């Protein structure tokens, strides 16, 4: 029989080796996490959620403001109402698509990172896998350009509401020349092209305009459009990160498929 001290030493050695094995396994697993894609996914989900949620509510508030104050005749803004309703349905589609696309890109990031870092033995990748990675690179570039347009488009209602808000601030300022001067300060939304020129009243002046700025619909819509624009900007940044990650991984996969080499992302 072995002495008790020798048996205890062997048990301690085995336990330390097990702990070391678990630690190395954890480090290896963490090494396979595509951190760039993970950050981009979180940023993409947050940006799309802000853009879609805030944009949907802000559009509904905009319609309410137009109907109550700038275009009392329903037929004058019927086309605008249909367009806004269509945009709200498009928002549902955008949210669903990017939720799925973000998950797919994250999964693709895990696949390419594991392949590049050779976590599961020697480097292995197929022509189909490289083709799929290339497809994601192209699609992400297209979506990035498209979201740049969405970001610019989302700034338009912010600009419009800012003009109305700044006009109201001028009306509230003590420099306004009495009641007659205030009533000459107006906002005409027809100049933005969202309602036709024959819409009535189309133009609001003075104290009536100030009352619009004090409504909850105006306050909420203005700030929600700002948040929606910020969400669109966050989505653009997320897609830029996706572009860099997918392009780098695809390039390394192509390179390592010809000659086993080192880098990783």
From Swiss-Prot:
GO MF annotation terms: structural constituent of myelin sheath
Subcellular localization(s) per the UniProt record: Membrane; Cell membrane
UniProt xrefs under InterPro entries: Myelin_PLP (IPR001614), Myelin_PLP_CS (IPR018237)
Primary location group: membrane
One Pfam family, short name: Myelin_PLP
Stated induction or repression of this protein's expression: By hypercapnic stimulation (CO2 inhalation) in ventral medullary surface neurons but not in the cerebral cortex.
One GO CC term on file: plasma membrane
SMART domains for this protein: PLP
Cysteine pairings via disulfide bonds: none
Biological process annotations from GO: axon development; central nervous system myelination; extracellular matrix assembly; negative regulation of protein localization to cell surface; negative regulation of serotonin uptake; ossification; positive regulation of bone mineralization; protein transport
Expressing tissues: Highly expressed in the ventral medullary surface, moderately in the cerebral cortex and cerebellum, poorly in lung and kidney, and not at all in heart, skeletal muscle, liver, stomach or stomach.
Residues carrying covalently attached carbohydrate according to the record: 73, 177
Coiled-coil ranges per UniProt: none
Bilayer topology term: Multi-pass membrane protein
Residues recorded as bearing Phosphoserine in the entry: 257
Transmembrane segments annotated in the record for this chain: 31-51, 90-110, 136-156, 224-244
Family note: Belongs to the myelin proteolipid protein family.
Role summary: May be involved in neural development. Involved in regulation of osteoblast function and bone formation. Involved in matrix vesicle release by osteoblasts; this function seems to involve maintenance of the actin cytoskeleton. May be involved in cellular trafficking of SERT and thereby in regulation of serotonin uptake.
Assembly mode: Interacts with SERT.
Protein name listed in UniProt: Neuronal membrane glycoprotein M6-b
